[in-house]
Amino acid sequence: MTAGGRRMSMVDVTGKKEEIRIAEASGFLRLTEDGVNAVKSGESHPQGKGDPIEVAKVAAILAVKKTPELVPHCHPIKITGVDVDVEVLEDGVKMSVRVKSEGKTGVEMDALTGLVVGLVTLWDMVKYAEKDEEGQYPHTRIENVRVVEKIIKEKE
């Protein structure tokens, strides 16, 4: 496949050894007081979509598993664990996604994908409480998305 005359290919990891790979990504969803209260109440919508935090956690886990389908150069790898932590603060929600694998390539993109989808899902779950009079989101935003840790360890 070419793009602009250049050859594109997925990185060949055949010669790499299998290692334990861990990555953690974190980010923040800034919300209004009404949005934070909607998260705290466990009710995402007057018509009942479910608990915003639990739905966002499930979405994050599913997104981690779907990363190779969404990010073209990510290898399909054996994910051995996903932990999603959510902390509700007075001005929004902090989320972190930690991904573990035994493989030949890292899991940073998987952690980032899980995090972003988790935060977007959380926004979707409480958007009714975030809209202003014109139906806009002047205060709601996703911030500080980053990889906070990457670990590579030899398999025992």
From Swiss-Prot:
CDD domains given in the database record: MoaC_A
User: Biological process GO annotation list?
Assistant: Mo-molybdopterin cofactor biosynthetic process
UniProt pathway = Cofactor biosynthesis; molybdopterin biosynthesis
* Gene3D superfamilies for this protein: Molybdopterin cofactor biosynthesis C (MoaC) domain
Which SUPFAM superfamilies does UniProt cross-reference here?
Molybdenum cofactor biosynthesis protein C, MoaC
Reaction(s) catalysed by this chain's protein? (8S)-3',8-cyclo-7,8-dihydroguanosine 5'-triphosphate = cyclic pyranopterin phosphate + diphosphate
Assigned EC number: 4.6.1.17
Task: Identify the residues that bind substrate.
Answer: M109, D110
The main enzyme category here is lyase
Q: Which UniProt keywords apply?
A: Lyase, Molybdenum cofactor biosynthesis
User: Any idea which residues are catalytic in this one?
Assistant: D124
Q: Does the keyword Transmembrane apply?
A: no
The UniProt entry, under InterPro entries, shows: Mo_CF_biosynth-C_arc, MoaC_sf, Mopterin_CF_biosynth-C_dom
Keyword field contains Lyase: yes
Pfam families, A to Z: MoaC
Any one GO molecular-function label of the UniProt entry: cyclic pyranopterin monophosphate synthase activity
Q: What family classification does the UniProt entry report for this protein?
A: Belongs to the MoaC family.
Q: What does this protein do?
A: Catalyzes the conversion of (8S)-3',8-cyclo-7,8-dihydroguanosine 5'-triphosphate to cyclic pyranopterin monophosphate (cPMP).
**Record note on quaternary structure:** Homohexamer; trimer of dimers.
Protein name per Swiss-Prot or TrEMBL: Probable cyclic pyranopterin monophosphate synthase
Organism in which the protein naturally occurs: Methanopyrus kandleri (strain AV19 / DSM 6324 / JCM 9639 / NBRC 100938)
